[in-house]
């Protein structure tokens, strides 16, 4: 088709335009490369197709040379660019390998006197904050040690033991509130001592008036010696009662005055001496101290002593004196020797420091405490 177009005489006038246009395009790349330009085509004749024949191969050769030259330039440029990139990457790797040992830490600036003063001031402030934080933590742990059911003047619980005991104590109280039942002393101590060390377990058992050896033996038992309700068997412990009034209340049950038929409890030999003494004093089998004026005052809100709630009775300062179990009943005939000398204040003794007050806040007055104290005796015999 191209040969036919160039051979037609009607298109001869357009051929020089294509030739001159091709020469104009080829001038710039040839001048850039430094090659000698081809000779200009001869001027067209008056009417012969000679100029068409002479001009026909010129644009084709120019276009083919230009395309070949451009392709070579592109290939050389691509190869050169790839080589430069590879060289730059190799140089970067070499520089990185050479600089790695130098970048192990931040560059230390020169410590001036002002910077030293600022650093010292920041360190002092940080030390003060840490000291205050530890003081607050120790104060909070001391307050926590006061409310957990484990107190000793000679032994101090560690921080982790205090937190574990507090967690167990909160769990035990939540279980008591959830069930609404009076807890068994052995199971209560087992709940408190879960996850604690042996010294802490012994301390908790001693604070709750439970023999640690009996506690360890009863842990594997199937519930023998526990509180099963009215008429159940009870195990005696060689510890005295924490309240000296419990013996008188037990004697009321032995004499048949305080609802002894409702609870078939085991009586003890030392109650008979108390009963005869109180009957001779005119108390009708009850302790004469219950009729004194110091028990007529109103009851104050319950207090928490060593983790156990107790009801404190307000009284005048004249009646504030200390009661000792062995001193109070040592002169009585047939009195039972005590294994421990527990000293309680008058308010603590009259309030009945025991764990049974945990749920029974509606305590009766002292002249109506027979059945309740029978249950307390049964609880502490477990």
Swiss-Prot record:
Biased composition (Low complexity): 50-59
Protein name: Neurogenic differentiation factor 2
GO MF entry, a single one: E-box binding
Record InterPro entries: bHLH_dom, bHLH_transcription_factors, HLH_DNA-bd_sf, NeuroD_DUF, TF_bHLH_NeuroD
Disease: Developmental and epileptic encephalopathy 72: A form of epileptic encephalopathy, a heterogeneous group of severe early-onset epilepsies characterized by refractory seizures, neurodevelopmental impairment, and poor prognosis. Development is normal prior to seizure onset, after which cognitive and motor delays become apparent. DEE72 is an autosomal dominant form with variable severity and onset in infancy.
Biased composition (Basic residues): 101-113
Residues making up the signal peptide according to the UniProt record: none
Pfam families to which the protein is assigned, alphabetical: HLH (PF00010), Neuro_bHLH (PF12533)
Bias (Pro residues): 36-49
Limits of the bHLH domain: 121-173
Function: Transcriptional regulator implicated in neuronal determination. Mediates calcium-dependent transcription activation by binding to E box-containing promoter. Critical factor essential for the repression of the genetic program for neuronal differentiation; prevents the formation of synaptic vesicle clustering at active zone to the presynaptic membrane in postmitotic neurons. Induces transcription of ZEB1, which in turn represses neuronal differentiation by down-regulating REST expression.
Composition-biased stretches (Acidic residues): 78-97
SUPFAM superfamilies: HLH, helix-loop-helix DNA-binding domain
Subunit: Interacts with TCF3, TCF4 and TCF12. Interacts with CDC20. Efficient DNA-binding and transcription activation require dimerization with another bHLH protein.
Domain description: The C-terminal region is necessary for depolarization-induced and calcium-dependent transcription activation.
Keywords, sorted A to Z: Activator, Developmental protein, Differentiation, Disease variant, DNA-binding, Epilepsy, Neurogenesis, Nucleus, Transcription, Transcription regulation
GO cellular component, one term: chromatin
Motif (Nuclear localization signal) on chain: 107-113
Superkingdom, taxonomy of origin: Eukaryota
GO biological process, one term: positive regulation of neuron differentiation
Region (Disordered) location: 1-129
Cell compartment(s), UniProt: Nucleus
